[in-house]
C-alpha cells in the first residue's frame, strides 16, 4: 500500500503502539486492531489495521496485515452499522454470544470510524 520513504511510523502492536523512526533496532511484532499512522513531508497519513505482523529494520518497515484500509477507502455507513451490531451483541443476554469476538468487532469498527474521520489530514499532525 505504501512503498516510499517516511519520517515516522506508529504501529498498533499487540502490547500497545510502537513508534518507529529511521535507524530503529530490528524487531518483529504482532499487530492488533488499531490505527497505523505515518508521516511523509510533514503530512500524516492513516490506515485502519487489523491482525498481522510488522518487521522493523533500521531502514525499512514491512507490514503483513489481514486488513489495511486507507481513510478514503472506508465505508463510513458500513462501519457505523458494524459498530451498532457489535454493541447489540455485547448488550445481548444470549448465552451463545461470543463476547470476545463482539469486542474485537467493536474495536475494529471504532478504529475504522476514527481513521475515516481523518481524511485529508493537515500538515504537521
Where are these regions (language model features)?
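Compact, glycine-rich, soluble single-domain proteins
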Residues: 1-81
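Acidic/glycine-rich phosphate/pyrophosphate-binding loops and surrounding catalytic core
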Residues: 68-125
